[in-house]
Amino acid sequence: MIKVLVVDDSLSVARQLEKIISESGDFTCVGHAKNGAEAIKMNHTEDPAIICMDMNMPGMDGLTALRTLSVMDKEVKVVMVTSLGGVGDKFTEALRLGAKNVISKPFEADNVLRILREL
């Protein structure tokens, strides 16, 4: 199974993503980080293949963490999660920094799994 780390400051969003991922049969959720700094630490300890990370979080946000991860770990695939939709500077910046895709909130299980499977 492919290991996925969920990063979101909202526990309800994180739990929803974890449930979708765990019930898929293709992926296993290896943990939940509440901000970018925790995500970077957990990337070292849990060694996920994929990180689903919120863009806007207190402390270290998703884009800052993505900048760090793209330098430190070229293998991990990062998918950003946002309520901003597919437009705007942050969306473009995430893709420029190496995000593989963006999941828009509110999300549906089929769309989340399609994006993860395409990686």
Report the location of each language-model feature:
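Acidic catalytic/metal-coordinating carboxylates
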Residues: N35-E38, D61-T64
